Amino acid sequence: MPKGIIGKKIGMTRVFKDGKAIPVTVIQVEPNYVVNIRTEDKDGYSAVVLGTGEKKEKRTPKPMLAIFKKAGLKPLRHLAEFPLKEGEQPEPGQEVKVEDVFEKGDLVDVTGTSKGRGFASAMKRWDFSGFKKSHGSRYHRAVGSIGACSDPGRVWKTKRMAGHYGNETITVQGLEVVDIIPEKNIILVKGSVPGAPKSVVKLKESVIIHRRKGKRKLERAKAVYAS
């Protein structure tokens, strides 16, 4: 089975456990289908390509249309590639459900596109403190100095200034799976994830479980949901 799955962010709510309120993000996992399999012999690595969401056939490129037809699937809108777990390998055209990939207490990394905020000031974009609000200050929300005078005589690249903010791919690591509702294809993840409601997100096995702190966090989470 793959180490990840494609879902859709619904919104945030909270659940109660032992009298404590836990903020969670509700993610709906629509039917995911295996589109293609990457193999060591052909591609040099092992992975699986999952797809979800309907797409019109006339809007699908012919090379992709051939891949879908080979797997016995209709064109799918969203595709993502995930590494494979050890054990049973999926077949092209097979449906992958959320309970096949994750269980309570797992740690996941969630990738999504952050909300676009348009042209934003340096204070909003980079969390600058700004100038004094009173006592004769000539500036309040200005950037301030953006470089030296004659040397180098220009503004350095990557200088933090006003500009386009948001609409970026962001990954939040080490979020805990609080609950899975198979009959509704819903997974509850502790904390917030990037993106607006109804935006597509990718959930995959967290990379921090291979670190010392991540292993301890995973052990604590598993112990909580085992009790």
Swiss-Prot record:
User: Biological process GO terms, please?
Assistant: translation
Q: Pfam families annotated for this entry? A: Ribosomal_L3
Keyword line: Ribonucleoprotein, Ribosomal protein, RNA-binding, rRNA-binding
Question: What GO molecular functions are on record for this protein?
Answer: rRNA binding; structural constituent of ribosome
Paired cysteines (S-S): none
Cross-referenced Gene3D superfamilies, in alphabetical order? 3.30.160.810, Translation factors
Task: Provide the Gene Ontology terms for cellular component.
Answer: cytosolic large ribosomal subunit
What is the top-level taxon of the source organism?
Answer: Bacteria
Q: Which PANTHER family match?
A: 50S RIBOSOMAL PROTEIN L3, LARGE RIBOSOMAL SUBUNIT PROTEIN UL3C
NCBIfam families named in the record: L3_bact (TIGR03625)
Function comment? One of the primary rRNA binding proteins, it binds directly near the 3'-end of the 23S rRNA, where it nucleates assembly of the 50S subunit.
Membership in a protein family? Belongs to the universal ribosomal protein uL3 family.
Q: How does it assemble?
A: Part of the 50S ribosomal subunit. Forms a cluster with proteins L14 and L19.
Q: In its UniProt entry, what is this protein called?
A: Large ribosomal subunit protein uL3
Ranked from the top, the taxonomy reads: Bacteria, Pseudomonadati, Aquificota, Aquificia, Aquificales
